[in-house]
Each structure stands twice: as C-alpha cells, then as structure tokens.
Amino acid sequence: MKIYLVGGAVRDALLGLSVKDRDWVVVGSTPQEMLDAGYQQVGRDFPVFLHPQTHEEYALARTERKSGSGYTGFTCYAAPDVTLEDDLKRRDLTINALAQDDNGEIIDPYNGLGDLQNRLLRHVSPAFGEDPLRVLRVARFAARYAHLGFRIADETLTLMREMTHAGELEHLTPERVWKETESALTTRNPQVFFQVLRDCGALRVLFPEIDALFGVPAPARWHPEIDTGIHTLMTLSMAAMLSPQVDVRFATLCHDLGKGLTPPELWPRHHGHGPAGVKLVEQLCQRLRVPNEIRDLARLVAEFHDLIHTFPMLNPKTIVKLFDSIDAWRKPQRVEQLALTSEADVRGRTGFESADYPQGRWLREGWEVAQSVPTKAVVEAGFKGVEIREELTRRRIAAVASWKEQRCPKPD
C-alpha cells in the first residue's frame, strides 16, 4: 500500500497559496484492508474512506469508463492493480493531475508542473470531453487563477467548444450549474467565468439571458464601452472589488437583463429596462433553482438600480416608498446591498472605474434618517391600528425631507 497527496492541495502549495482541503490516493489496497486499518467508508459509487484521526478523504486508486450520458454516466474500477498514473489520468486538468509522496517528491506524469509554470489550464486526456461538468470547472478555475495570469490552452478551449456544440451541457442538472456558478462568484475575478463560457459557446446554452446582452448597444455618452454584455462583465468585476457577498455579485450580474428585450429599432435607448428585467431574473433563477434570498435581491436591483442613480431628484415620499418596496424595515442589509450594486453599475464603465458615487452615500444617510424615527412615539401619541403605519410614514417622510434639504439638495 502506498499513499499519495493529490490534486488541489499539491497544486496550491506549488503556487504558494494556502491549502484548505487535502485529498489522498491509496495505491495497492482493497476496501477491506482500509476498513481493517480503521478507515470509515463513505463513498457509495466508488471506495472513498475517512481517516480515523484527521477525517481527511482517502480514495482507492481508480479508473473511470464512460457508460452513459452526462457527468454521472461513468463506471468506476478500483483495484490494487490500478496505478497512480492510471488514477491521475482520469483527472480534468494537468495541474490537478499532480501527486506528492511521503518524501515530498512530486509525481508528474502529464506535465502539470510545466503547465503550472506556464500558467496554462490544459486537459489531461481526450476523456475530458466525456464529462460536461468540466466545461464549468475549467471556467471556474480560469476565474480563480486569473490574478496569477492563467489562461486556457487553445486545444482545451477547442474541446470545450466541441462539447458545447455536441449538446453535452444539456445533461447538466440545474443544481450542478448553480453550484459551479456560485463557487465562481466567490472568486477574485468572477467575470472571467462568464467570459470563458461565452468563448466556448456555453453562455448561450446555460445563461441565454446574459448572452443576449452582447451586441446590444447603449448610449455612448453614458456607456463608452457601448456593448451591454461588456458592461455587465465590467460591473461584475467592480462588484467583486466592492463586496465578497455572492448575492451582491449575482444581483449586479443580472441588473441589466431587461436591455436584452429592447427592440433593435429603439436602440441604443432602453427605457423601462429595469422593471422589464425582473421577469428575466425570475426566469433565470427558477431555471437554475437559485436560492430565494439571492433571487429576491437580484429582482430588486434590476427594478430599482436606475432609480437610485437619480437619488438627488427623488422627493422624500418616493425615498420612503423605496425603503418600503425593498422591505428595508425588516431587511435593513438590503440598503447597503443596493448601494453597492448601484455603485458597481456606475463604476463598471470604461473610464469611470474610479468615479465617486455620492448617491450611495445619500441612500445610506437617508435610510439612517428614516429608520431613526421612533415607532414608540407614534403609539404613545395615541395612534391606533392602520393609523400607526400612516403616521409613521408621514413622520419618516418629514424627517427625510428635512435631511434632504440640508444634505442632498435637488440639483438645479
């Protein structure tokens, strides 16, 4: 029996990154030998065991053979005669097909070290094309390591295109698509994930609402980048700089979906695109089974981001109504989330990356003023039932009006 550290732990250590999870491959052993040694079996479809002390995963070396459609259609073979090289060959990328023995020596049968050095994401073998989930995984790796200068090898991108055009991605379940997307949204450069999907044709298949934005022009006066798809990825990049929250990043990604519905004869204007985009947000989220909390914020951002841009021109009643509409009294975090997504929208434009966004500050300040109006004082004043709500709203509007006159005057 020989045990090797494999995959991401080896890769990230060589890149000088922190290692979170460690996976091990056991060569020359059987399930019974692992159980006799105190390991606990957890894999149903293939033999994976938990170490009795560390609880890290130890998998018997195995090979996989395509036996059906999609990413689950594989037959696994694990036996003592499966070599380390056999096991590493079934992995997706050469940089993930590295192993380290107990002496610290790196085993590299597929030139993963060379690709690490050259910052290349390259598939190990043609078997890559048998698993459609790998298209998303490579896009996610491209986003995760973009800041280190990694790019996808030409032949791997070609294979990803072939898989997409062959209809392989249609076998992916919504849950797996969302899981990979959610993980990509946590990376430093989530926009790279969607750009890679577009480069291989997968964006049109998995995210048609986003793909439809490319080639749709916006007024050059407001959008020097002109293309709405490019603007969308720029805003996502900016959102990633402003917030680590997946819901903020996803909402920013979806903020302009309504522009994809504008008839070409009305281009480059997109009047009413915000409310129009709400249905597309709902459609996308329902299809991918996006969690409700993330979906709800994306709907609100699509509907209200343009309104927040005009904050100095809003009257106090409209401002308080905005807080009502986003349910800020019960979910106050939404004020900050809308401020961040709206700022990402403004700064996600060519030449505006460092622009100030005072509307965000005013939105936050206006909220502090509105929510500081005490409910208790209204009740003590003798108001009852629906009168409490009406009087509370009236006092909030008055407080916001007083604040706005001093801090956020309406422009001439």
Swiss-Prot record:
Keyword Chloroplast: no
Cofactor(s) listed in the protein's UniProt record: Mg(2+); Ni(2+)
Annotated family: Belongs to the tRNA nucleotidyltransferase/poly(A) polymerase family. Bacterial CCA-adding enzyme type 1 subfamily.
One biological process term in Gene Ontology: RNA repair
EC number(s) reported in the record: 2.7.7.72, 3.1.3.-, 3.1.4.-
Gene source species: Shigella flexneri serotype 5b (strain 8401)
Positions bound to ATP: 8, 11, 91, 137, 140
Keyword terms, alphabetized: ATP-binding, Hydrolase, Magnesium, Metal-binding, Multifunctional enzyme, Nickel, Nucleotide-binding, Nucleotidyltransferase, RNA repair, RNA-binding, Transferase, tRNA processing
Name of the featured protein: Multifunctional CCA protein
Task performed by this protein: Catalyzes the addition and repair of the essential 3'-terminal CCA sequence in tRNAs without using a nucleic acid template. Adds these three nucleotides in the order of C, C, and A to the tRNA nucleotide-73, using CTP and ATP as substrates and producing inorganic pyrophosphate. tRNA 3'-terminal CCA addition is required both for tRNA processing and repair. Also involved in tRNA surveillance by mediating tandem CCA addition to generate a CCACCA at the 3' terminus of unstable tRNAs. While stable tRNAs receive only 3'-terminal CCA, unstable tRNAs are marked with CCACCA and rapidly degraded.
GO MF terms, alphabetically ordered: ATP binding; CCA tRNA nucleotidyltransferase activity; cyclic-nucleotide phosphodiesterase activity; magnesium ion binding; phosphatase activity; tRNA binding
SUPFAM superfamilies: Nucleotidyltransferase (SSF81301), Poly A polymerase C-terminal region-like (SSF81891)
Domain free text: Comprises two domains: an N-terminal domain containing the nucleotidyltransferase activity and a C-terminal HD domain associated with both phosphodiesterase and phosphatase activities.
Reactions listed under catalytic activity: a tRNA precursor + 2 CTP + ATP = a tRNA with a 3' CCA end + 3 diphosphate; a tRNA with a 3' CCA end + 2 CTP + ATP = a tRNA with a 3' CCACCA end + 3 diphosphate
Domain HD: 228-329
Residues involved in Mg(2+) binding: 21, 23
